[in-house]
């Protein structure tokens, strides 16, 4: 007797390897429970692979954008640019680590649900596995806007610092010119008195 409220959803095709692992770990499970569990693991693997690929593409895009935007500032002020690029790389690493922590949390949640499956009814277990799979498939882990915002902030800071340095150099140049004029006037006045 099955619960009529549990709706049938299409099961993601699981690899033979994944199915065999699930069968080994759950020898007394029904074929449907094994298929749903294997589908959950496939969804997790699919999502993790997509996130790794997206993170790689996003990291490459962010890096190229940062290099293009900051190329002028890098030539003019290499030390400042090096510090800013290091900060961007650090931010990207932190975002990647956060994404892996989310994937690990999803995996842990799925494993906990598999362990609890022996204690709950077959229908409740299948429902929990389907919900976990849906959560994995709908979860967005990469925050593209935050990485682009960090790159833009780095560019703004580099330009602002460069303008401050240029103003200071211009001010020094003006003071040196004024000092040279004053020295020349004093020197010519001294020689004019002697003649």
Q: In which residue ranges do the predicted regions lie?
A:
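Amphipathic alpha-helical membrane/lipid-surface binding segments
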Residues: 15-195
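N-terminal acidic, proline/glycine-rich, low-complexity intrinsically disordered segments
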Residues: 1-11
């Amino acid at each position: 007797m099955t619960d009529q409220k549990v709706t049938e959803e299409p099961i993601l095709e699981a690899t033979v390897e994944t199915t065999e692992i699930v069968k080994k770990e759950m020898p007394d499970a029904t074929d449907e429970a094994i298929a749903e569990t294997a589908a959950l693991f496939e969804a997790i693997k699919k999502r993790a692979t997509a996130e790794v690929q997206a993170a790689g593409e996003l990291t490459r895009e962010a890096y190229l954008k940062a290099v293009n935007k900051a190329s002028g500032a890098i030539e003019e002020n290499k030390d400042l640019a090096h510090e800013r690029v290091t900060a961007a790389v650090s931010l990207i690493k932190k975002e990647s680590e956060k994404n892996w922590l989310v994937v690990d949390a999803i995996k842990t949640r799925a494993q906990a649900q598999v362990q609890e499956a022996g204690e709950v009814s077959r229908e409740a277990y299948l429902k929990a596995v389907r919900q976990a799979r849906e959560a994995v498939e709908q979860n967005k882990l990469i925050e593209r806007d935050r990485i682009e915002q960090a790159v833009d902030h780095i560019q703004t800071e580099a330009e602002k610092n460069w303008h401050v340095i240029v103003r200071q150099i211009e001010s020094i140049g003006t003071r040196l010119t004024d000092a040279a004029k004053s020295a020349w006037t004093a020197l010519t006045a001294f020689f004019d008195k002697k003649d």
